């Protein structure tokens, strides 16, 4: 074994505390009591480092690795560090090299080599390549490489969302099934035993969206086609890296081979342990040697577990002591990132979570930080808000680097409108998500494409949105008109003429839709003629302004039924639809020429879609979702668009009454009490949470709410009640994850946190320690 030397002495001869003192001196750091306790780990038992946001998780891992090397517990290349992102992996490598270099300056010389820092995906892929069957495989980063072929498998298009959106929801569901270990074939839940109807019921339960059976039938066809395309082209995706590796591990010789490769690692550390999923744990716990597993180190923060929608499972960090017997737990309670005046605001919020590991939350930056609260009586987007004026002022301040400012949002719709508004001020946001660009939004596209269809006399735009005028049946009607005329129309006017002929010879209920379109189209075309014929500029401008209003009105009137249906079925938020419509109407009101509007919109979209072009702009801004922001930090943070879409004041009560992991007997006792004293509010809460199973109880005469114990002695009624219990527990867990999301957002801020509250704000915002309103003194 190579030695770590200090001058002409072997450092192994020194005590751990002496080595820690040397490292403090060489790295110019002062370690806290909590850090010193962790660094004194003797590598004989499993260890959980429960590290709060901003506590220096990467730093403590690298220091632990260096001490293990210095004490002779392991060579550098016998240490394995696993994380979830490529960025974190690079950060580990850079931090290790930096510390080794700085320590060499004081004569503390480490042997050559370094630990293996890797992501789960990279590690699994490297092992899979040892299998001859997969050596020629290529990595497929996204299903979108085959998007056209996959879209063709959708035989039951939705009246509500596009095929592209259907595919996104199908693959989100597939990720969840795989990461939770619910499927071994990568398509159907194993517990369905190949029975499609059973599988559909199970998938409907796992999906966060509401779909009919036809969606799940198409899901099966899409995923089977996807598997075929990957096989034909020798591709494996990130999920395959787990599924195929686990499958090959069922063969003893492969499992033993993989274990021999992994046996070189005497020390293993898993970072961001709160993000691990069932499959990753199953694989890594089988690959590591029993000796290494016996002192496995995991670092994470249960308060930052925010990826359950893709299958991450916080139960591993929450139950680590049960997972690995004799496990120790040490906390890192000090946040070195966020100023105390900001951190103190979020502590009451995160402590309201019922399921969390207890730890103190302390700020290293005492009496620092600025928490700015903006209050408004108006819901929705407002370009005239004080917070946005403050944001623009900071962006334009030459003393502030734009890279130090970030806007964090919960929903894409919030990101869209603000990013577009900023682009109008020539401030361009790095949105990191094409679907969050307003011009790509479905509500925006529906309205503007119908406006283009009527103004430019373009059939293709009308055809794109025909199903939003009269749903799928009207779209089918337009295709029949095309077929009967034997014409792929270029102009909307040609379609309307052909529709007149078709409707005259057939008894079709869709004649009324065609006539409505024709009335609006003819009105707009008359305006167009008048504008082109007048020589009076003022009159032309006045006509043009009126025409723009009528054009917008025509597009919205034609699609009213569609949007009403979407909102009623909870496929779209009424507030979001209204916000986009209102924003679009206000923006159109600033134009005298509709062609200028269409041109400017394309120009904005071009810049917002192209990072190269964004880089050439004078002002840019980081625009991230709360999920994307995890692991990052900024001097100035704006939390924007925290609406009550996911949790409202009614549904929040379910978490208070029925916290996650509540035992069934306690749940029954609580249900009786709540039902008796708060029945109306309980009903509103269940409706707001979209928990519809409660109707099975209220509509069932066999249920006696007064004598519930007797009712639950019946098998059928108990099963119904237990299903409701599970649905409420799932929703209560969602509420706690939403708290964690808000906690993550607040703790991204170093110096200043800006937050806006409005009538439609998420009620969790009010769990922050918000500044009290100053009382007016009577004169």
Where are these regions (language model features)?
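Helicase P-loop NTPase motor core
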Residues: 54-61, 65, 326-328, 334-427, ...
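Conserved beta-strand -> loop -> alpha-helix junction used to position metal-binding or nucleic-acid-contacting
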Residues: 108-128, 426-454
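Conserved helicase C-terminal RecA-like lobe
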Residues: 452-748, 752-754
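Long, charged, helix-prone linker segments
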Residues: 760-779
